[in-house]
Protein backbone atom coordinates (compact mmCIF):
# COMPACT_ATOMS: atom_id res chain seq x y z
CA UNK A 1 0.00 0.00 0.00
CA UNK A 2 1.06 3.54 -0.79
CA UNK A 3 0.51 6.81 1.04
CA UNK A 4 -2.55 7.72 -1.05
CA UNK A 5 -4.33 4.69 0.43
CA UNK A 6 -4.30 6.40 3.84
CA UNK A 7 -5.99 9.46 5.25
CA UNK A 8 -3.68 12.38 5.96
CA UNK A 9 -4.58 12.12 9.66
CA UNK A 10 -3.30 8.53 9.82
CA UNK A 11 -0.04 9.13 7.93
CA UNK A 12 1.96 10.56 10.85
CA UNK A 13 1.78 7.32 12.80
CA UNK A 14 2.34 5.24 9.67
CA UNK A 15 5.64 6.94 8.74
CA UNK A 16 6.96 7.34 12.31
CA UNK A 17 9.56 4.56 11.97
CA UNK A 18 10.22 4.76 8.21
CA UNK A 19 13.69 5.46 6.87
CA UNK A 20 14.54 7.63 3.87
CA UNK A 21 14.29 4.87 1.26
CA UNK A 22 10.98 3.62 2.62
CA UNK A 23 9.56 7.15 2.54
CA UNK A 24 10.47 7.63 -1.11
CA UNK A 25 8.78 4.38 -2.09
CA UNK A 26 5.74 4.96 0.12
CA UNK A 27 5.03 8.47 -1.20
CA UNK A 28 5.94 7.93 -4.88
CA UNK A 29 2.34 8.35 -6.10
CA UNK A 30 1.36 11.07 -3.62
CA UNK A 31 0.09 14.49 -4.74
CA UNK A 32 -1.87 15.77 -1.71
CA UNK A 33 -0.16 18.78 -0.15
CA UNK A 34 -1.07 17.71 3.39
CA UNK A 35 0.44 14.27 2.87
CA UNK A 36 3.60 15.75 1.38
CA UNK A 37 3.97 17.94 4.47
CA UNK A 38 3.88 14.78 6.59
CA UNK A 39 6.61 13.34 4.38
CA UNK A 40 8.78 16.46 4.71
CA UNK A 41 8.35 16.48 8.47
CA UNK A 42 9.60 12.90 8.67
CA UNK A 43 12.51 13.70 6.31
CA UNK A 44 13.52 16.55 8.62
CA UNK A 45 13.23 14.29 11.66
CA UNK A 46 15.47 11.67 10.03
CA UNK A 47 18.08 14.35 9.30
CA UNK A 48 18.01 15.47 12.94
CA UNK A 49 18.32 11.89 14.18
CA UNK A 50 21.25 11.27 11.83
CA UNK A 51 22.99 14.43 13.02
CA UNK A 52 22.46 13.46 16.67
CA UNK A 53 24.01 10.03 16.03
CA UNK A 54 26.96 11.68 14.27
CA UNK A 55 27.50 14.08 17.18
CA UNK A 56 27.32 11.22 19.67
CA UNK A 57 29.97 9.32 17.72
CA UNK A 58 32.21 12.41 17.76
CA UNK A 59 31.79 12.68 21.54
CA UNK A 60 33.19 9.16 21.94
CA UNK A 61 36.67 10.26 20.84
CA UNK A 62 38.19 10.39 24.32
CA UNK A 63 36.51 7.20 25.52
CA UNK A 64 37.85 5.29 22.51
CA UNK A 65 41.40 6.35 23.30
CA UNK A 66 41.18 4.15 26.38
CA UNK A 67 39.45 1.10 24.96
CA UNK A 68 39.55 -1.74 27.49
CA UNK A 69 40.03 0.56 30.47
CA UNK A 70 37.43 1.73 32.98
CA UNK A 71 36.75 5.33 31.96
CA UNK A 72 35.06 7.76 34.33
CA UNK A 73 33.64 11.14 33.33
CA UNK A 74 33.49 13.88 35.97
CA UNK A 75 31.69 17.21 35.99
CA UNK A 76 30.27 19.69 38.47
CA UNK A 77 27.42 22.14 38.77
CA UNK A 78 26.96 25.03 41.12
CA UNK A 79 30.18 27.02 40.96
CA UNK A 80 28.43 30.29 40.15
CA UNK A 81 25.32 30.46 42.37
CA UNK A 82 25.03 32.59 45.48
CA UNK A 83 23.47 29.75 47.44
CA UNK A 84 23.63 26.00 47.80
CA UNK A 85 26.45 23.45 47.62
CA UNK A 86 28.63 22.64 44.65
CA UNK A 87 27.79 19.17 43.33
CA UNK A 88 30.05 16.83 41.37
CA UNK A 89 29.17 13.59 39.63
CA UNK A 90 31.44 10.76 38.53
CA UNK A 91 30.04 8.45 35.84
CA UNK A 92 31.16 5.15 34.35
CA UNK A 93 28.97 4.42 31.35
CA UNK A 94 27.49 0.98 30.75
CA UNK A 95 28.71 -1.19 27.87
CA UNK A 96 26.88 -0.55 24.62
CA UNK A 97 25.62 2.81 25.83
CA UNK A 98 23.57 4.77 23.33
CA UNK A 99 22.22 7.97 24.86
CA UNK A 100 21.53 9.90 21.67
CA UNK A 101 21.02 13.59 22.34
CA UNK A 102 23.35 13.59 25.35
CA UNK A 103 25.19 16.91 25.60
CA UNK A 104 26.30 19.57 28.03
CA UNK A 105 23.37 19.88 30.44
CA UNK A 106 23.23 23.65 29.89
CA UNK A 107 22.38 23.04 26.23
CA UNK A 108 19.44 20.74 26.96
CA UNK A 109 15.84 21.55 27.78
CA UNK A 110 14.60 20.74 31.27
CA UNK A 111 12.43 17.98 29.79
CA UNK A 112 15.36 16.44 27.90
CA UNK A 113 17.60 16.60 30.98
CA UNK A 114 14.95 14.85 33.06
CA UNK A 115 14.53 12.13 30.43
CA UNK A 116 18.28 11.53 30.18
CA UNK A 117 18.65 11.64 33.97
CA UNK A 118 16.13 8.83 34.35
CA UNK A 119 17.80 6.74 31.64
CA UNK A 120 21.31 7.33 32.97
CA UNK A 121 20.64 6.75 36.66
CA UNK A 122 18.94 3.44 35.84
CA UNK A 123 21.86 2.19 33.73
CA UNK A 124 25.25 3.73 34.55
CA UNK A 125 27.58 3.46 37.52
CA UNK A 126 27.71 6.86 39.19
CA UNK A 127 28.34 8.66 42.45
CA UNK A 128 27.60 12.15 43.74
CA UNK A 129 30.02 14.28 45.72
CA UNK A 130 29.22 17.59 47.39
CA UNK A 131 31.05 20.46 49.03
CA UNK A 132 28.99 22.49 51.45
CA UNK A 133 28.45 26.22 51.61
CA UNK A 134 30.72 26.27 54.67
CA UNK A 135 33.49 24.54 52.72
CA UNK A 136 33.04 26.91 49.78
CA UNK A 137 33.44 29.89 52.12
CA UNK A 138 36.40 28.29 53.92
CA UNK A 139 38.46 27.06 50.96
CA UNK A 140 37.11 29.06 47.92
CA UNK A 141 34.91 27.71 45.15
CA UNK A 142 37.74 26.23 43.07
CA UNK A 143 39.11 24.13 45.93
CA UNK A 144 35.60 23.18 47.04
CA UNK A 145 34.85 21.97 43.51
CA UNK A 146 37.91 19.73 43.56
CA UNK A 147 36.85 18.43 46.96
CA UNK A 148 33.40 17.53 45.62
CA UNK A 149 34.98 15.75 42.63
CA UNK A 150 37.31 13.72 44.85
CA UNK A 151 34.37 12.70 47.01
CA UNK A 152 32.39 11.56 43.97
CA UNK A 153 35.31 9.44 42.74
CA UNK A 154 35.87 7.93 46.19
CA UNK A 155 32.20 6.89 46.42
CA UNK A 156 32.24 4.94 43.14
CA UNK A 157 31.74 1.19 43.69
CA UNK A 158 34.18 0.52 40.84
CA UNK A 159 37.68 1.99 40.72
CA UNK A 160 38.28 3.73 37.38
CA UNK A 161 41.50 3.57 35.37
CA UNK A 162 40.99 6.86 33.55
CA UNK A 163 39.38 10.15 34.56
CA UNK A 164 37.95 12.49 31.94
CA UNK A 165 37.42 15.79 33.75
CA UNK A 166 35.78 19.01 32.66
CA UNK A 167 38.59 21.58 32.82
CA UNK A 168 40.14 20.45 36.10
CA UNK A 169 43.26 18.64 37.32
CA UNK A 170 42.73 16.46 40.39
CA UNK A 171 46.15 14.81 40.84
CA UNK A 172 44.63 11.46 41.80
CA UNK A 173 47.48 9.32 40.52
CA UNK A 174 45.15 7.84 37.90
CA UNK A 175 45.30 8.67 34.21
CA UNK A 176 43.62 12.07 33.88
CA UNK A 177 42.51 14.12 30.90
CA UNK A 178 41.42 17.68 31.63
CA UNK A 179 39.19 18.68 28.72
CA UNK A 180 38.14 22.29 28.13
CA UNK A 181 34.37 22.32 27.56
CA UNK A 182 34.49 18.60 28.18
CA UNK A 183 30.75 18.37 28.76
CA UNK A 184 30.29 19.06 25.05
CA UNK A 185 33.17 16.83 23.90
CA UNK A 186 32.88 13.62 25.93
CA UNK A 187 29.77 11.51 26.48
CA UNK A 188 31.04 10.45 29.91
CA UNK A 189 31.48 14.05 31.07
CA UNK A 190 28.16 15.03 29.48
CA UNK A 191 26.44 12.24 31.42
CA UNK A 192 28.03 13.49 34.65
CA UNK A 193 26.89 17.01 33.78
CA UNK A 194 23.27 15.94 33.34
CA UNK A 195 23.11 13.86 36.53
CA UNK A 196 24.79 16.56 38.61
CA UNK A 197 22.54 19.29 37.21
CA UNK A 198 19.26 17.47 37.83
CA UNK A 199 20.41 16.28 41.26
CA UNK A 200 21.34 19.80 42.35
CA UNK A 201 18.16 21.32 40.91
CA UNK A 202 16.12 18.88 43.00
CA UNK A 203 18.15 19.81 46.06
CA UNK A 204 17.53 23.52 45.51
CA UNK A 205 13.82 22.83 45.07
CA UNK A 206 13.83 21.20 48.50
CA UNK A 207 15.59 24.22 50.00
CA UNK A 208 12.97 26.43 48.33
CA UNK A 209 10.26 24.64 50.29
CA UNK A 210 11.92 25.81 53.50
CA UNK A 211 12.93 29.26 52.24
CA UNK A 212 10.48 30.37 49.52
CA UNK A 213 11.62 34.01 49.47
CA UNK A 214 14.49 33.51 47.03
CA UNK A 215 12.94 31.61 44.11
CA UNK A 216 15.46 28.76 44.49
CA UNK A 217 13.15 26.37 42.64
CA UNK A 218 13.61 28.46 39.50
CA UNK A 219 17.05 30.02 39.80
CA UNK A 220 18.93 27.14 41.51
CA UNK A 221 20.65 29.71 43.72
CA UNK A 222 21.86 32.02 40.95
CA UNK A 223 21.60 35.76 41.46
CA UNK A 224 18.39 36.56 39.62
CA UNK A 225 16.39 39.70 40.38
CA UNK A 226 13.90 37.81 42.53
CA UNK A 227 16.73 36.18 44.46
CA UNK A 228 18.43 39.53 45.07
CA UNK A 229 15.12 41.12 46.04
CA UNK A 230 14.63 38.34 48.58
CA UNK A 231 18.08 38.97 50.01
CA UNK A 232 17.37 42.67 50.42
CA UNK A 233 14.00 42.07 52.06
CA UNK A 234 14.67 39.02 54.25
CA UNK A 235 18.45 38.77 54.59
CA UNK A 236 20.55 35.64 54.14
CA UNK A 237 20.05 32.00 55.07
CA UNK A 238 22.48 29.30 56.13
CA UNK A 239 22.42 28.16 52.49
CA UNK A 240 23.95 31.41 51.20
CA UNK A 241 27.65 31.73 50.40
CA UNK A 242 29.06 34.47 52.60
CA UNK A 243 32.23 34.75 50.52
CA UNK A 244 30.25 35.65 47.38
CA UNK A 245 29.18 39.15 46.42
CA UNK A 246 26.81 40.85 47.03
CA UNK A 247 26.31 38.72 50.16
CA UNK A 248 29.83 39.41 51.41
CA UNK A 249 29.12 43.13 51.45
CA UNK A 250 25.58 42.72 52.77
CA UNK A 251 26.61 40.88 55.94
CA UNK A 252 28.91 43.74 56.89
CA UNK A 253 25.87 45.90 57.57
CA UNK A 254 24.03 45.45 60.84
CA UNK A 255 20.58 45.19 59.28
CA UNK A 256 21.53 42.17 57.15
CA UNK A 257 23.95 40.51 59.54
CA UNK A 258 21.36 38.15 61.03
CA UNK A 259 20.93 34.83 59.26
CA UNK A 260 17.32 33.69 59.04
CA UNK A 261 16.78 30.09 60.07
CA UNK A 262 13.19 29.59 59.00
CA UNK A 263 10.39 31.48 57.22
CA UNK A 264 8.30 33.77 59.33
Swiss-Prot record:
Cofactor remark from the record: Manganese or magnesium. Binds 1 divalent metal ion per monomer in the absence of substrate. May bind a second metal ion after substrate binding.
A Pfam cross-reference name: RNase_HII
Reactions that this protein is recorded to catalyse: Endonucleolytic cleavage to 5'-phosphomonoester
Keyword Manganese: yes
Binding, a divalent metal cation: 75-76, 166
Record EC number: 3.1.26.4
Gene Ontology molecular function terms on file: manganese ion binding; RNA binding; RNA-DNA hybrid ribonuclease activity
Keyword Transmembrane: no
Named cofactor requirement(s): Mn(2+); Mg(2+)
Enzyme class of the recorded protein, top EC level: hydrolase
Domain RNase H type-2, residue spans: 69-263
Any single GO BP term: DNA replication, removal of RNA primer
One GO location term (cellular component): ribonuclease H2 complex
Compartment list: Cytoplasm
Disulfide bond residue pairs: none
InterPro entries in the cross-refs: RNase_HII, RNase_HII/HIII, RNase_HII/HIII_dom, RNaseH-like_sf, RNaseH_sf
Keywords: Cytoplasm, Endonuclease, Hydrolase, Manganese, Metal-binding, Nuclease
UniProt similarity note: Belongs to the RNase HII family.
Role according to the record: Endonuclease that specifically degrades the RNA of RNA-DNA hybrids.
The name this protein goes by in its record: Ribonuclease HII
Source organism of the structure: Macrococcus caseolyticus (strain JCSC5402)
